[in-house]
């Protein structure tokens, strides 16, 4: 006889306050506009809406094709600050707040590193940087799009927590978390220790491998 499960919806609450998010335990991982096509972005986001789970934007920012899908979205912020950057590549609070406060954006994920290329940045080659991608990311069309290996906004755990608090405030108190791969366990330990000492925490942590 199958066991009785009190809650078969398999969801967990992330964040606190009115903008906390009741998140499914199964979601769509980061899939950038630019890495995959507009129809693929919209189809995945529509699936998120139908299935009542979330779709992570990947580092390519929130595009009109995500919005067309209408599904719950996790906006990933990478070292390139795509969608929330100034012309010189620095983080822009005003541009961030404009997108982060959209109803469809449920959580913010700061990408520190990823398992596919731990410790490295990335590049979208110039031929792939179309007008739409350039407008979405806030970059120049037809030029190589560079994701630096590290963030300008922080370089240690204390600065990271300060940045998390900043994004939380700018987004209207939406959940803000981090994504990283565990190249060296002490890196995560130092972040956790800093949170414990400060009594200030990220809302979630995405672990992307242990490379």
Where are these regions (language model features)?
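Conserved, well-structured core domains of diverse proteins
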Residues: 1-49, 53-56, 61-70, 76-116, ...
């Amino acid at each position: 006889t199958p066991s009785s499960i009190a809650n078969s919806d398999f969801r967990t609450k992330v964040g606190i306050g009115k903008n906390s998010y009741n998140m499914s335990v199964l979601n769509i991982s980061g899939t950038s506009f630019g890495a995959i096509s507009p129809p693929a972005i919209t189809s995945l986001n529509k699936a998120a809406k139908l299935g009542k789970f979330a779709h992570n934007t990947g580092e390519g920012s929130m595009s009109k094709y995500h919005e067309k899908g209408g599904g719950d979205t996790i906006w990933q912020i990478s070292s390139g600050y795509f969608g929330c950057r100034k012309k010189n590549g620095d983080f822009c609070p005003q541009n961030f707040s404009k997108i982060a406060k959209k109803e469809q954006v449920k959580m913010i994920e700061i990408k520190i590193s990823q398992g596919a290329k731990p410790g490295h940045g990335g590049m979208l080659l110039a031929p792939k940087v179309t007008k739409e991608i350039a407008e979405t990311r806030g970059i120049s069309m037809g030029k190589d799009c560079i994701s630096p290996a590290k963030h300008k906004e922080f370089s240690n755990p204390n600065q990271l927590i300060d940045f998390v608090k900043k994004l939380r405030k700018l987004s209207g108190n939406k959940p803000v978390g981090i994504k990283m791969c565990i190249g060296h366990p002490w890196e995560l330990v130092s972040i956790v220790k800093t949170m414990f000492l400060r009594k200030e925490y990220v809302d979630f942590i995405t672990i992307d491998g242990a490379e």
